[in-house]
């Protein structure tokens, strides 16, 4: 055994052993408890970042710990390989996205392997390979035939730079999340998943997810957005509009119906188009509205604008004529693209009415009173008692809801209705590097799904896109085909699927990744699913996690899986953050400098007071800690850390820096501290092993000092078992091991019994660290005399008897101040403890001349004497 800790050698040997033994390849073992641990698979961007290291280390620690509990553990890995970055890189480097992607996968796989992850690489999936997306296309055709997928024209967010449609969530402040381009609204034919058909179940089954963070469940509840309200119809006729009909609106506040003073419609609404026919000003305004974002968040914050149409509708209960306005804050895809405006009790309507001098009529008595003067107050939106509402005066919200419904039903102008904020999922993307949509367009037969025996529709991999829309639409060799129904010439669909589709079912494919008879092999899926522990960032709370839950229910209804939910437990790991440093240039731009290129000056208390660039010695500004990102140049290359310190040091630091659900702040000194700790473990083990391994520990003959050491060993086991097994608090488990190391380093090694006790301590340290620092643990376990590898060892078992103390040291306080301590038998009664405290020499000095009023005994901890 080397005298010095040599991580490179140790880690290479451990990884070679695991590879040769196929240590992490698993198969179904009926009767053995399974555990499926999965971290969200990476996009093959080119190289790992510290966020990856943290994510995959957390999953690996959990996987290895569960294996030590005797479970059959599956931890797979794969690649979320389709997407725009590959196309962008391809254009920049004039290389096909496939080549760029596969090269990145090869490099990143070698990086992941160097971390020593307990991954079953035999189950690796790559979503851009036909053997994967074939089954996605197969499911698409099944769902299309059932009507769960359908095609319709939709108003979409069009990114003019990326030449593709973006989901609402991909539009940030009116701009594309990737390109930064101003988004336009367009009407184009698209394919949609009917996720709204599952809205109720997606909402209700959140209650089953007891292992999910409440924050994530709340975000999903809000996104699904179930609301009970009323559909109200405002009649119009030939005199007022030129045709007869009703304007439908949905409102969650029917109690305020008598306060409606105008109605507002979306730019795409039929009445807007009707009014704009001979109105150039309105035509221009509608065009402006259509150029804006269709994301609700953007609509909520933008300036409210509108134009009157000159059209009028009737109030359904009073017959009063209400003007129709086109307003930019009304969305066509929410409700019916129209709102009844009640300025007195809705903030948007209030703002709009005051801007355009429209009437404001208060109809609810709120905590602010009976009138609602500007500026807006939150109280105006409260529920309350109805006023100025005729026959409905005096009713509360619930009473008004029911009474309004009765009145509207009588006139056949309304009824209660449940509505969801959730929209159907548009998955068509006008880009190349994605899964082809398996539909053939035939003039005679319409949209025809590609037959199963013609799947997969293979994406040509030798294409270099140029950024002008999808190259597939310019490739007759791809889109020209014959109709499977009638045999006539037809055209293949050239749109590809949203890449969120691939990541919505990959976890299920891992159960049987090589199965050629279907999307999953049912027996394997039932054996492994649902995933026991899923790990990933909270930024995926809505999109990915909601889509995966939806897909699981689709697969269940197709008979592919048996469970209702894909992930039993969810851990949302925090970000890795680091200091930022910058200079503001003369033109106002920021230049960011990597922490490795900056030298810090500290005061006497080690607080950073200034920073300078090493290259030129000139000052730089300290920008505070932010998420590691290319944009702030504050990332640390994991590979350089692994090369310098070893994977175990990186893993240890990442798990010690903070609890997994909190942000972890990168610290060079913290990494060095983790490395020093592993060197201490190695040094103690090396010294112990060099003397020869001791015989068996005789627990019955331990002296008092040895009992204290053994108590520390089992206290560490108890605390670490709780922290790792129940709370995923790896940082406190590591702290417990460090405390134990302090005890072991000071322990006597004079006798065989002393050395046997240190042996138990070192074995415990090795086992407790095994999930976190597996390489050094692999080596130490072998050197400590074990023939079987540490990956096959069990988690250490707590000996409760070792925690029993014969005597306790109790603190004595007089009037809350420390005045002494006493050693008492652990079984001492309260009376015996109090008597000993009163008799303590130092205590007698401090209560001299005082009357003892009360004695408080906290068992096993302290005695407080209250005297005056």
Swiss-Prot record:
Biological process (GO), any one: leucyl-tRNA aminoacylation
Residue interval(s) of motif 'KMSKS' region: 627-631
EC identifiers of the protein: 6.1.1.4
Residues noted as binding ATP in the record, renumbered to the chain: 630
This protein's UniProt keywords: Aminoacyl-tRNA synthetase, ATP-binding, Cytoplasm, Ligase, Nucleotide-binding, Protein biosynthesis
GO cellular component, one term: cytosol
Single Gene Ontology MF annotation: ATP binding
SUPFAM superfamilies hit by this protein: Anticodon-binding domain of a subclass of class I aminoacyl-tRNA synthetases, Nucleotidylyl transferase, ValRS/IleRS/LeuRS editing domain
Top-level taxon of the source organism: Bacteria
Pfam families membership: Anticodon_1, tRNA-synt_1, tRNA-synt_1_2, tRNA-synt_1g
InterPro entries per UniProt: aa-tRNA-synth_I_CS, aa-tRNA-synth_Ia, Leu-tRNA-ligase, Leu_tRNA-synth_edit, M/V/L/I-tRNA-synth_anticd-bd, Methionyl/Leucyl_tRNA_Synth, Rossmann-like_a/b/a_fold, tRNAsynth_Ia_anticodon-bd
Similarity comment text for this entry: Belongs to the class-I aminoacyl-tRNA synthetase family.
Protein name according to UniProt: Leucine--tRNA ligase
Gene this chain is encoded by: leuS
